[in-house]
Design a protein with these regions (language model features):
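Short, surface-exposed secondary-structure edge patches
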Residues: 40-45
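Short, charged beta-turn/beta-strand-edge "cap" motif at the junction between a beta-strand
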Residues: 57-61
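Polybasic/polar functional segments that serve as interface/processing modules
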Residues: 34-37
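C-terminal terminal-subdomain/extension
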Residues: 1-30, 96, 100-156
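Compact nucleic-acid interaction/catalytic patches
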Residues: 62-104
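Loop/turn positions that initiate beta-strands
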Residues: 48-51
Length: 156
């Protein structure tokens, strides 16, 4: 294990261009993933429809990245895996059928095309709105469900 560690450090020292910010961010994300494995978020308080801060990490190309709020859509039975729908303020009111505006939060859009499954360890803490844990309204839930059906059945 010690040799593996030394070899990895040596390779990184030679191969990384420390002037390339994207490569530095990626290395930081690798380190952050180690820390995430120690995260023991209390999953008992999490439920579908809640909005939570989720660490999407430093991904490749135009994949979604960084810490951002996301809707907890559904979980595995033991709540160790969650399907999440990230939220964005940049897509609000843009009329794409795979973006669903959330009426219960100011300038928030559910990015259905970036729906993903993650370990509960990526869930940081609840997202608050008006001093309360944010949760989808029944109308927002229904609107997302309709949009998801369109997105996954190619009915636009």
């Amino acid at each position: 294990l010690k040799l593996l560690k030394e070899s990895l450090i040596q390779k990184l020292s030679k191969k990384i261009d420390y002037k390339n910010i994207e490569k530095i961010k990626y290395l930081k994300w690798c380190y952050d993933k180690l820390l995430l494995n120690d995260n023991n978020t209390k999953t008992s308080i999490l439920k579908p429809g809640s909005i939570c801060w989720v660490d999407f990490g430093q991904n490749v190309g135009s994949e979604l990245r960084k810490l951002r709020p996301a809707i907890l859509w559904r979980s595995s039975a033991d709540k160790k895996m969650w399907t999440v729908i990230p939220l964005s303020s940049k897509c609000y009111n843009d009329k794409y059928y795979f973006h669903c505006d959330i009426n219960g939060l100011p300038c928030s859009t559910a990015k259905l095309e970036s729906m993903a499954n993650f370990s509960y360890k990526r869930l940081r803490e609840p997202f608050f709105h008006n001093k309360k844990i944010a949760h989808l309204s029944e109308d927002d839930y229904s609107n997302i469900l309709v949009s998801l059906k369109k997105y996954y059945t190619f009915e636009n």
